[in-house]
Amino acid sequence: MSLPRNPQKPLLSAENWTTAAPAHHVTLLTKDGCHLCADARTVVRAACQDTGSEFSEVDITTDAALLRDYANFIPVVFVDGIPWDQLRIDERRLRDVLS
């Protein structure tokens, strides 16, 4: 639960509390020329938009450590900073975890 939105209303008023869970943050690791990355981008963007989750994309070629660690495994999806899926992204599973 969050803090009351309107302190003028009684605390037990249904209008005074929000119950929505915070949106997740999804990060997609990609690189140019990766056809699986293009497919994953479509899936991840749609799932994030439909669930109200934040989406960001990181090109692994801009960071030597990411390139070293993930060059053979992209695309990689992180949900809330935790590695979640790689290569062919399962849209149904992603939507389930973001719901």
Model-predicted segments: where are they?
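Local sequence-structure signature of Cys/Sec-based thiol-disulfide redox active-site neighborhoods
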Residues: 15-47
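N-terminal leader/targeting and pre-domain segments
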Residues: 2-18
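Non-catalytic, surface beta->alpha helical segment in thiol-disulfide oxidoreductase systems
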Residues: 81-99
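Short acidic active-site motifs
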Residues: 62-66
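Conserved strand-to-helix beginnings and helix N-cap segments that scaffold or border functional pockets
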Residues: 38-41, 67, 91
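Conserved helix-turn-beta segment immediately C-terminal to the redox Cys motif
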Residues: 41-59
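Structural micro-motif
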Residues: 71-77
